[in-house]
């Protein structure tokens, strides 16, 4: 499992959890797992076309996924994903 750090404004949708355990795979799969656990997050992270909203930035550790493989960046067991 990996974990996603939840930004403070979105914690009200995760029962005030600062971090949530998610399945590993790719970044997009991990974020989808998060929204399956907390469906109210979906509209805040994804647009009508089910693409991540343009203002959502995602990091694995300190690396911006846009500098890696984007949404298809592999997520390993124990990785920390941050949503900004």
Protein language model features and the residues they cover:
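Ubiquitin-like/PB1-type beta-grasp interaction modules and other compact soluble beta-rich domains
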Residues: 1-84
